[in-house]
Regions:
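Soluble metallo-hydrolase cores and metallopeptidase-like ectodomains found primarily
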Residues: 168-194, 258-339, 362
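Second-shell loop/turn segments in exported
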Residues: 57-65, 81-96, 112, 186-187, ...
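Noncatalytic luminal/extracellular "stalk/propeptide" segments of secretory-pathway proteins
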Residues: 72-203, 210
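Extracellular/luminal Protease-associated
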Residues: 92, 100, 153-266, 270, ...
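Secretory targeting signatures
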Residues: 1-56
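Metal-dependent peptidase/peptidase-like ectodomains
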Residues: 281, 375-483, 490-495
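Alpha-helical metal-binding/catalytic segments enriched in His/Glu/Asp
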Residues: 106, 208, 312, 323-382, ...
Length: 536
């Protein structure tokens, strides 16, 4: 599958869709109020090797989920982030250290560990950027360059990287200084083609939420009109919810293949693309667009190279070659710790692997082969999972029974205000019936949790791209649609949580962590051993 077909939360698209894509509230064909943070049930019921029979299936009892150990995994991952920006961006030294830590952890847990590496298109942020605006002093222009060090009385506003502005996916570089007096052209919501044409050779400034709705569409329009760079200001997404009355900028990706197509087969290396907060953007508007001020925009970014990303996997070979895989992405956006997206999911993968390691030590060889993987490259377009499925395609086509994806499987600590649901969806009707059955068991066994949290269940067994088809918003996508050249539809099950308004912002840290939601996540996973095997 080409990357322009990926509709992941990172590649596509609407700023206004970001929270909906992560909470999957638009996906549900059915929802059930049940006990506990559903990831528990989700993994229990979907990672199970499901088998539906005339007789009720005994799913067994639950194993103990170690919340303290899981929190330790979270802390370990966060400690590997960038020393200043805090993220574990794909292709960086931080992502490499993370993958090596994971690979070693799988080996320590008794799995056969393998560290896959792939060379993929990836942009890199090479140094601290600078974004400033300046109102010239009283003597600027009289033999003294406006906004130069000698311009007495100048007023310079320095915007804070990560808080006020964020570099966007596959941005190029820029080096505009005050002395160049680069013009910034107001593009409104992007619907007026004449404004785009007037911005040729200049910096375009677009207000998010308009008819040109995705980063890809914006960058394509900028290329078509030969803009020097592009600024997108957030005035419509999560305003007044996480930082005063401001609308915090978020990182979004762009489709690499669409940009190549628009630019004649090469990347626009000299076109920077950043997003700004509402408050910061309004300062820029006042000083530069509607005033006599100047802009400095220095973005040291490379977007035309391939970088190495990593996929560590731990495998325990069972009595059969039938394969169950559970995974989450270990990379984050470049400018945030990613405590929820997706450190929470990756740590849960580790805890499930640890529980199975303990179970195998006590009960012997499992019936099926178990594999745990984490993915690099997710935030920029599912690069790691796509490359892994491509490499392992024959084996996966023949043996994959089920892939389970854990991406932001977490409920915010303020669940009463922000939402208390966890979402489970799958693309197989039989698997869905087992999810329902295990959910009902969990509800009976955990009545207090049933009152506290809500679970949503969804079945998406339609064709690709259809409203009832499996969405491609995370790393499960290639496991569903890329087997045998798309001729075999793989089975997958996906878990999301709710309430992470800090998604893709610098504020995605442990201050919003709800450890209870992780503790309940996956302790029923072992039940796959209680269900007879069938061929997919």
């Amino acid at each position: 599958m080409s990357d322009d077909e990926v509709i992941s939360a990172e590649i596509a698209e609407e700023w206004s869709e970001a929270s909906n894509r992560r909470s999957a509230l638009d996906f549900f064909q059915s929802s059930t109020a049940i006990a506990g943070i559903l990831v528990v049930l989700f993994v229990s019921s979907t990672f199970l090797y499901f088998y539906l029979d005339e007789e009720p299936v005994d799913y067994g009892t639950s194993l103990q989920f170690d919340a303290e150990r899981t929190r330790g995994y979270i802390d370990d991952l966060l400690a590997l982030g960038h020393p200043t920006w805090e993220g574990r961006m794909s292709g960086t030294a931080e992502e490499q250290a993370t993958a090596e830590y994971i690979n070693n952890l799988f080996e320590e847990l008794g799995y056969q560990s393998t560290l896959h590496t792939y060379e993929v298109p990836m942009h890199s942020v090479n140094s601290e950027p600078s974004l400033r605006v300046c109102v010239p002093g009283a003597i600027g222009g009289i033999g003294i360059a406006p906004c130069s060090p000698a311009d007495a009385g100048q007023q310079v506003t320095t915007f804070n990287h990560r808080m006020d502005y964020v570099i966007q996916g596959f941005s190029g570089e820029s080096s505009f200084t005050f002395d160049q007096n680069m013009e910034v052209v107001y593009l409104g919501d992007g619907s007026d083609d004449s404004l785009w044409a007037a911005a040729e050779g200049k910096i375009g400034y677009i207000v998010g939420g308009g008819s040109v709705s995705s980063n890809t569409d914006i960058m394509v329009k900028a290329i078509e009109n030969d803009l020097a760079s592009i600024i997108r200001v957030n005035k419509n997404y999560n305003c007044g919810t996480i930082e005063g009355n401001d609308c915090v900028p978020i990182f979004k990706g762009t489709s690499h293949s669409a940009i190549l197509d628009a630019n004649g087969g090469t990347m626009p290396t000299g076109m920077a693309f950043i997003a700004m907060s509402k408050d910061a953007g309004e300062i820029l508007e006042s000083v530069v667009i509607n005033g006599t001020g100047r802009i400095e925009m220095i973005m040291d970014v490379t977007n035309d190279e391939e970088l190495t990303i990593r996929v560590p996997c731990g495998t325990y070979y069972g009595k059969s070659s039938e394969l169950l895989i559970v995974g989450g992405h270990h990379d984050t956006v470049y400018h945030a710790p990613g405590a929820v997206d997706d450190t929470s999911g990756t740590a849960t993968v580790f805890e499930i692997a640890a529980m199975f390691s303990e179970y195998i030590a006590e009960n012997g060889e499992p019936d099926r082969t178990l594999r745990f993987c984490t993915w690099g490259g997710e935030e920029e377009g599912l690069w790691g999972s796509i490359a892994y499925v491509d490499e392992m395609n024959q084996d996966l086509t023949e043996n994959l029974r089920l892939y389970i994806n854990l991406d932001m499987n977490h409920v915010d600590i303020d669940y009463e205000t922000r939402g208390n649901s966890v979402t489970l969806f799958t693309n197989d009707a039989d698997d869905y019936k087992h999810i329902e059955a295990i959910a009902e068991e969990y509800k009976k066994d955990n009545p207090l949790m049933a009152e506290k949290y809500r679970i949503n269940l969804g079945l998406y067994d339609g064709p690709k791209g259809a409203a009832n088809g499996m969405p491609c918003n995370s790393d499960h996508c290639p496991f569903v649609y890329n087997l045998d050249g798309g001729n075999t539809i793989g089975r997958a099950a996906v878990c999301y949580g709710s309430g992470s308004l800090e998604y893709h912002t610098y504020l995605d840290d442990t201050s919003r962590l709800n450890e209870e939601s992780l503790r309940n996540f996956c302790y029923d996973i072992w039940k796959l051993h209680e269900v007879p095997s069938i061929q997919p």
